[in-house]
Amino acid sequence: MIRVGIIGGGQLGRMLALAGYPLGLRFRFLDPSPDAPVADLGELIVGAYDDPDALARFAEGLDVVTYEFENVPAHVARALERQVPVYPPPAALDVAQDRLSEKTFFNALGIPTPRYVAVDDRAGLDAAVAELGLPAVLKTRREGYDGKGQAILRDAADLDAAWQTLGGRPLILEAFVPYDRELAILAARGRDGSVAVWPVVEIEQVGGMLHRAFVPARSVDDILAATARGYVEIAMAELDYVGVLAIELFQVGDALLVNEMAPRVHNSGHWTIEGARTSQFENHLRAILGYPLGETDALGAIGLQNLIGEMPDPSAILAIPDAHLHHYGKAPRPGRKLGHITVRAADEVTRDERLAGVDAAACLASGRGSSSNLTR
């Protein structure tokens, strides 16, 4: 019996386990919370990610270790690597955990990003604004996700408030990008260097969190798709990567700029569970175990919507043809990802109609107005 260890017990770990059980895998998780969403899916070691005793109990007898979020301390991953193979490699954490390191990594590979300046103090912020101009986005270099740890600077009056909120730690100022839309590209790379890439995803974000995703992304020509594919393949090769890697992109005209990367399975790839021949979760497991990678083509026109704060009535969702509900087993809380819904259709028009129905049900549950703008 192959035993897989997953650092982190959230919904990504849960979906990895659900993809792995048909392969005959067994799972052990490390998470600080006894109520983590994975609690009923395998052995759960409750402890801090840097607790030596918890780590020792976690690592014992495992065949491979992976992680479901990128803020695992890199030194912890390296320590585990002395006992058991760890994928993706800890070097990927070094890059992804620091926004400055991430930008310099891509630029060194010839891959464009928004312009940026490191900010270490208040005077440095003024100098960075003078160099990049306004508007701009001030971000913490470490941690921060789903729109957290950042502030938009629209004019000089915003600087003091942003510094009061974010100052006192390493920051980065990024030039504001007037992008046409946001895209994502996900790929899996095996131990043998083989690569499988899913179709380009169009994503819509609300408040810094992914709200909806569409596959195929509309009007993506072969050149644009090849550019996105090239970015992820170059990054994977440089890191000798194993597992799934996601890269979020800004499209500006015919150009693609890298916004950020995630060295793990990713929200923009949840559609692959029902919408691709092989899901990101299964291919991640195949990759880290040295199995052949599965095919990644989409099974029609696919849409995804996140469920934030409140869960809708399952009956309302499941009445929509080819709609698939995923509940993460988390207690409702404002701003919290509780689940997602994937819809499939033979064409984009039908897909968008079904996704509008999903949105209406989700809005009814949350008490907000419809967010649908699906005249795409």
Question: How does the language model describe each region?
Answer:
Residues 196-199, 245, 256-260:
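Protein kinase-like catalytic core scaffold
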Residues 286-376:
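Peripheral (often C-terminal) accessory segments that flank ATP-dependent C-N-forming ligase machineries
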Residues 95-184, 188-235, 357:
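Active-site nucleotide/adenylate-binding loops and adjacent lid/helix of ATP-dependent enzymes
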Residues 226-247, 252-253, 262-310:
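Active-site "cap" helix and flanking loop/linker of ATP-utilizing ligase/carboxylase catalytic domains
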Residues 208-218, 260-273:
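Short, flexible active-site loops
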Residues 1-104, 123, 359:
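ATP-binding N-terminal substructure of ATP-dependent carboxylate-amine bond-forming enzymes
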Residues 187-191, 249-253, 329:
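Short, low-complexity Ser/Thr-rich regulatory SLiMs
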